[in-house]
Amino acid sequence: MDVITMSIFLFERDNEKSVIDNLRLLIQMSLKSIELLKDYMNSKDEKILKEIIKIEEEGDETTKNIRINLEKAFLPNMRRELSRSAELLDETLDSLKHAAMLYELLKEEFDEYLKNEIDLVLMITVDMFQHLDRVLDVIEKGGDLDPIIKEIKDKEKFIDDVYQNRIYKYLINLEVESFWEGKILCDFIDNIVNISDYIEDVADELHIIYLHTK
């Protein structure tokens, strides 16, 4: 069967479909947390922080449900990749929670340059999550995965370039009040930037499943 028109038909039973649906749910949770984090960076509203923490806790439960359904599913050769995908998506929620909690500790707001760079990273990250959702479409319904994987990898490389060549170089020369203020700032940015690595890793795990079906 032509790869481009290939349909996998492996996720039609309840347990298999539940795994995919819960992976999608983790993606939607991450997208929601990103929007909340952006709002929190503008307001430091404690209610928003609590909502981000609550979403992370719900993500833990969703990840547990995925593991349970994987044990019941009939795809033993794909369990590792799907379980790892769930763990990585759960890590994105952890990173967003930690980023919000670190931002709470910062005494100073970001200057315009740094805020714009972080907004750019978050915008590209949102786009990567949307592409990851398209990967699940192909895994579930069939299609050509390679162009979507390439887009995700290109966007991850772009975020790496922004971090290495713009944010990191800027931070080196940034004056901060204390060592701890600087560490909190760097840890915040690391949590934001690392999300793109998690997304790329999920895409790689799902790509393995796709290749198994060829």
Curated annotation (Swiss-Prot):
Pfam families the UniProt entry points to: PhoU_div
Transmembrane domains' residue ranges: none
Domain of life: Archaea
Protein family: Belongs to the UPF0111 family.
PANTHER family according to UniProt: UPF0111 PROTEIN HI_1603 (PTHR36536:SF3)
Name this polypeptide is given: UPF0111 protein MJ0629
Organism this protein belongs to: Methanocaldococcus jannaschii (strain ATCC 43067 / DSM 2661 / JAL-1 / JCM 10045 / NBRC 100440)
Lineage per the UniProt record: Archaea, Methanobacteriati, Methanobacteriota, Methanomada group, Methanococci
